UniProtKB/Swiss-Prot annotation:
Catalytic activity: tRNA(Leu) + L-leucine + ATP = L-leucyl-tRNA(Leu) + AMP + diphosphate
Gene Ontology biological process terms in this record: leucyl-tRNA aminoacylation
Protein species of origin: Chlorobaculum parvum (strain DSM 263 / NCIMB 8327) (Chlorobium vibrioforme subsp. thiosulfatophilum)
One Gene Ontology cellular component: cytosol
Organism placement in taxonomy: Bacteria, Pseudomonadati, Chlorobiota, Chlorobiia, Chlorobiales
Name of the protein described by the UniProt record: Leucine--tRNA ligase
Gene Ontology molecular-function annotations: aminoacyl-tRNA deacylase activity; ATP binding; leucine-tRNA ligase activity
Pfam families listed in its UniProt record: Anticodon_1 (PF08264), tRNA-synt_1 (PF00133), tRNA-synt_1_2 (PF13603), tRNA-synt_1g (PF09334)
InterPro entries, per database record: aa-tRNA-synth_Ia, Leu-tRNA-ligase, Leu_tRNA-synth_edit, M/V/L/I-tRNA-synth_anticd-bd, Methionyl/Leucyl_tRNA_Synth, Rossmann-like_a/b/a_fold, tRNAsynth_Ia_anticodon-bd, Val/Leu/Ile-tRNA-synth_edit
Positions with a binding annotation for ATP: 579
Motif ('KMSKS' region): 576-580
Length: 807
């Protein structure tokens, strides 16, 4: 009987669906394992082989944990609101809902054809009113807690798309060729900054890649500094700046404020006013990225005003420059060009003084010195001296002096800004707020507030969403009076902030999630997705989760206990897959050619899961040959009879099998799937070479392989007489004695260089290892005439001699 992947994969996918094989159990006595994908946006281009990598990894873990006796929750859904469907609607007039439904159907079919063991009864869609009812409910809870507010915000406006972009979205849109400018707009904003400290501290509680944690730390950007008041000459007020280096105050030679600073025009003297206004207008046309880029040429304009340095009484010129942002600190900085590269470049361009106040190894007029490791110089007045002090001591002494003089105060600041939450588009969750004629706002009482049908999807010329044109939906009256509904909708991030909770209890119409179910399943044990979401989805989800924790809706402080970022699979040309490059490999094509099991195995065998690696279609053919070898362990293709026997395997085969159990188990637990597969290949080769068709070894192999290649293993499992699914088979346990080599190869090094090897029995004592190593002929000559300073023996692995010539 030949291996026909197409027939048997369809057979088992249909049976799994009919029998709901992978539905999570309601039994809360079993240990749970919640494994989750970052659910996809269902685009019109469909899934390619790169998309399948993360989904395959989570499915392997789901199947592996089921075999280990866990109650597994492994769901799938759709992050289906978003701009692409709306842009398609603008071009074609097709309702975004229809486009989304079509795309979802395509994605679902591909995922099912991969044999992923999702519990499809828990499928969610962020555009479903029964789902976004609870997204709106969370928003209203944020509003009640004062964490959602309206503000006139300078936003990133994309003229072509007629939409506001979050700061985190700007880079991508510019890269796609869109123009992004700054303009003020009435916006809903979420006060994520209220949770900045907790978002920072609780990173220590989760098992995440360190680079992702660091990206979030940098994005939150906690800094300890001092706010210092500089008295403005000719103005009866102060200019407050924020600095993390009060120890350099004596070296400040000018101040800089942002173009949006409320005092920008007020500080301009008559002769400078025209230039100042012109500069402010030019700054509005730039994005923050364009303004703050390190390679950007420094620009600025002098206001004509001066402020007094509280440390030495000097009058410092006040400049305006777009590299300073109002959103960070106070929107004003003191510039110490000798010890800050950006300030140094600005000073050089505009001929401003440069004064050394940190002892430098070179002339600061020629090169900046920004090291904290040196000590202060030229930093004293009649009341205080910090000369000779290190950074920390000088910081504390200067801060204390400024506070005692009423000229400053210690302050913790964050780069993190409140989250601009509203979008001027149709295809998003309506914000459930009513604006009354008396200026008050009240929440919608009947959720969900659904989207009305519209004739055109273009944003209005005023920047409002198309909802502003639907008067029958827009205006209403209730017991509080006449009202106008909010026309902004939520960003795509809203629905993905909490979807992991809805998977736990997707049909609940009375609560976001049942408390007992939430307490059993949370938090997510393993979350796999791309690192590109480090400061977007992951940060937003953590914020919402902490709000829900404070509300008593969830029982954990963090949503995702373990995070793993898969590496990107590149095209065969070693470039990122994209339509423009023509290097996209559609998932459906390779599935029809090679089958799901081969694709799953090849995706995982390409290399370490976390690494970037190129696709090679020829490589998958080797995987197909491996699967045929597995098939032939059970079936004789010539006689169409089974080969399986009840014979006891030889001692050598048993040892090989238990080594494989140990290696595959350990590697799977650590998501080292490529080496787990390699170990199974070694086992299959051994069984084939020795002609071992023992039921014991074959069934063990099938269970080990089942998370990786579920269709072929399910078929062969049933062929061997089992009536229950292999997904419920017990994961094999290795015998430590059999999994250990009797004889080991020991490496011998001299001064860290390999000079020979010898064989020794397992458990060989360190002293015996050292003596045996000295007798190795190729080693002895490197010890001759040498004094052995140190002898190191690592049991079962190596011996190293540290030597030096004898005196």
């Amino acid at each position: 009987m030949k291996y026909d992947f197409s027939a048997l994969e369809k057979k088992w996918q249909a049976r799994w669906a009919d029998e709901q094989t992978f539905a999570s159990s309601a039994d809360q006595d079993k240990p749970k394992y919640y494994v989750l994908d970052m659910f996809p946006y269902p685009s019109g281009s469909g899934l390619h082989v790169g998309h399948l990598e993360g989904y395959t990894a989570t499915d392997i873990m789901a199947r592996y944990k089921r075999c280990q006796g866990h109650n597994v929750l492994h769901p799938m859904g759709w992050d289906a609101f978003g701009l692409p469907a709306e842009q398609f609607a603008i071009k074609t007039g097709t309702h975004p809902r229809l486009t989304t439904e079509k795309n979802v159907a395509s994605f679902r079919e591909t995922l099912k054809s991969m044999g992923f063991s999702y519990d499809w009864s828990r499928e969610v869609n962020t555009t479903d009113p029964n789902y976004f009812k609870w997204t709106q409910w969370i928003f209203l809870k944020l509003y009640e807690k004062g964490l959602a507010y309206i503000s006139e915000v300078d936003v990133n406006w994309c003229e072509e798309l007629k939409v506001v972009l979050a700061n985190e979205e700007v880079d991508e849109k510019i890269a796609d060729g869109y123009t992004v400018v700054r303009r003020p707009l009435r916006q809903w904003v979420l006060k994520i900054t209220a949770y900045a400290e907790r978002l920072l501290e609780d990173l220590d509680e989760v098992d995440w890649p360190e680079n992702v944690k660091q990206m979030q730390r940098n994005w939150i950007g906690r800094s300890e500094g001092v706010e210092i008041d500089f008295e403005l000459r000719c103005h009866r007020t102060n200019l407050r700046v924020y600095t993390t280096r009060p120890d350099t105050l004596f070296g400040a030679t000018y101040l800089v404020i942002s173009p949006e600073h409320p005092m920008a025009e007020k500080l301009a003297i008559a002769q400078q006013l025209v230039e100042v206004k012109k500069y402010i207008e030019q700054a509005k046309l730039k994005t923050e990225l364009e303004r703050t880029g390190l390679q950007k040429e420094k620009t600025g304009v002098f206001t004509g005003s001066y402020a007094i340095n509280p440390a030495n009484g000097e009058a410092l010129p006040v400049w305006i420059s777009d590299f300073v942002l109002t959103s960070y600190g106070t929107g004003a900085i003191m510039s110490v060009p000798a010890h800050d590269s950006r300030d140094w470049e600005f000073a050089k361009k505009f001929g401003l003084p440069i004064r050394e106040v940190i002892k430098s190894p070179h002339d600061v007029q020629e090169e900046v010195f920004d090291g904290k490791e040196s000590v202060c110089v030229n930093s004293a007045n009649d009341e205080i001296s910090i000369d000779g002090l290190d950074f920390k001591t000088a910081f504390d002494r200067m801060a204390t002096w400024l506070e005692s003089k009423g000229k400053g105060k210690r302050k913790v600041n964050y780069k993190l800004r409140d989250w601009v939450f509203s979008r001027q588009r149709y295809w998003g969750e309506p914000i459930p707020i009513k604006h009354y004629e008396d200026g008050t706002m009240r929440p919608e009482t009947n959720l969900p507030l659904t989207l009305p049908e519209v004739e055109a999807y273009h944003p209005t010329s005023t920047g409002e969403s198309p909802l502003a044109n639907i008067e029958s939906w827009l205006y209403g009256e209730d017991e509080h009076g006449k009202f106008r509904r909010e026309t902004n909708t939520m960003p795509q991030w809203a629905g993905s902030c909490w979807y992991y909770l809805r998977f736990i209890d997707p049909q609940n119409g009375n609560a976001l999630v049942d408390p007992s179910r939430e307490q059993y399943w949370m938090n997510v044990d393993l979350y796999i997705g791309g690192a590109e979401h480090a400061v977007l989805h992951l940060l937003y989800s953590r914020f919402w989760h902490k709000v829900l924790y404070d509300l008593g809706v969830v029982s954990t402080k963090e949503p995702f206990q373990r995070l793993f970022n898969q590496g990107m699979i590149l095209g065969e040309d070693n470039e990122k897959m994209s339509k423009s490059r023509g290097n996209v490999i559609p998932a459906d094509h390779v599935l029809s050619t090679y089958g799901a099991d081969a694709v799953r195995l090849y995706e995982m065998f390409l290399g370490p899961l976390e690494q970037v690696k190129p696709w090679n279609t020829h490589g998958i053919e080797g995987i197909s040959r491996f699967l045929n070898k597995v098939w032939r362990l059970v079936w004789d293709e010539n006689t169409e009879t089974q080969k399986t026997t009840d014979d006891k395997p030889s001692e050598a085969v048993l040892k090989r099998m238990h080594k494989a159990i140990k290696k595959v188990t350990e590697d799977t637990e650590q998501l080292k799937f490529n080496t787990a597969i390699s170990e199974m290949m070694v086992l299959v080769n051994e069984l084939t070479k020795t002609g071992c068709y023992s039921r014991e070894t074959t069934e063990t192999l099938l269970v080990l392989l089942s998370p990786f290649a579920p269709h072929i293993t399910e078929e062969l499992w049933q062929t061997l007489g089992h009536t229950e699914s292999i997904s419920g088979a017990v994961w094999p346990v290795f015998d430590a004695k059999l999994a250990t080599d009797d004889v080991l190869t020991i490496a011998v090094q001299v001064n860290g260089k390999l000079r020979g090897t010898f064989e020794a029995p397992a458990g060989y004592a360190k002293e015996d290892m050292i003596e045996s190593a000295k007798k190795v002929e190729s080693v002895a000559k490197f010890l001759e005439g040498q004094q052995i300073i140190k002898e190191i023996a690592v049991p079962g692995k190596l011996v190293n001699f540290a030597v030096k010539p004898q005196q």
